[in-house]
Amino acid sequence: MRAVVQRIKEGKVTVEGEITGECNFGLLVYLGVGREDTVEDAKYLAEKIVNLRIFEDQEEKLNLSVKDVGGSLLVISQFTLFGDCRKGRRPSFSEAAKPDEADYLYQEFVRCCNDVGMTVGTGVFQAHMMVHAINDGPVTMLIDSKKTF
């Protein structure tokens, strides 16, 4: 499972002009599910992101988590995070999970975040979405449950 995590001042996602999720302060999480991913990957990534210390403390050190600062999450499904662009000019998505499995694990990730008390806004799985965000910092992290960057 792979995530691009951005610290944001605010964000929202719309589908066909309707707001489906929003976050007034916290993290925007683009979440991709790989074909080898399991519920354990969803649990690992949820725990990692909720406790990731990328907010500044009083000494301006990145020492606080989204949970510590009372923020929320905006989670957007994004299979393109598993796009492989190494060959040719068209990305291959063969490493992305099939839609049914990806949706299940996406929902499991959201549930894991909710279970630890996080407020989570979401997009609509497989929908064409418009994501609006005001980045803070910017602070952007790449996290993968199976490999390092």
From Swiss-Prot:
Known EC number: 3.1.1.96
Sorted UniProt keywords: Cytoplasm, Hydrolase, RNA-binding, tRNA-binding
SUPFAM superfamilies, per the entry: DTD-like
InterPro entries in alphabetical order: Daa-tRNA_deacyls_DTD, DTD-like_sf
Example GO BP: D-amino acid catabolic process
Domain of life of the native organism: Bacteria
Cytoplasm as UniProt keyword: yes
Residue window of motif Gly-cisPro motif, important for rejection of L-amino acids: 137-138
Reaction catalysed by this enzyme: glycyl-tRNA(Ala) + H2O = tRNA(Ala) + glycine + H(+); a D-aminoacyl-tRNA + H2O = a tRNA + a D-alpha-amino acid + H(+)
Record-level GO cellular component terms: cytoplasm
Location of the protein in the cell: Cytoplasm
Family per record: Belongs to the DTD family.
Job of this protein: An aminoacyl-tRNA editing enzyme that deacylates mischarged D-aminoacyl-tRNAs. Also deacylates mischarged glycyl-tRNA(Ala), protecting cells against glycine mischarging by AlaRS. Acts via tRNA-based rather than protein-based catalysis; rejects L-amino acids rather than detecting D-amino acids in the active site. By recycling D-aminoacyl-tRNA to D-amino acids and free tRNA molecules, this enzyme counteracts the toxicity associated with the formation of D-aminoacyl-tRNA entities in vivo and helps enforce protein L-homochirality.
Complex and partners: Homodimer.
Protein name (database record): D-aminoacyl-tRNA deacylase
Organism of derivation: Alkaliphilus metalliredigens (strain QYMF)
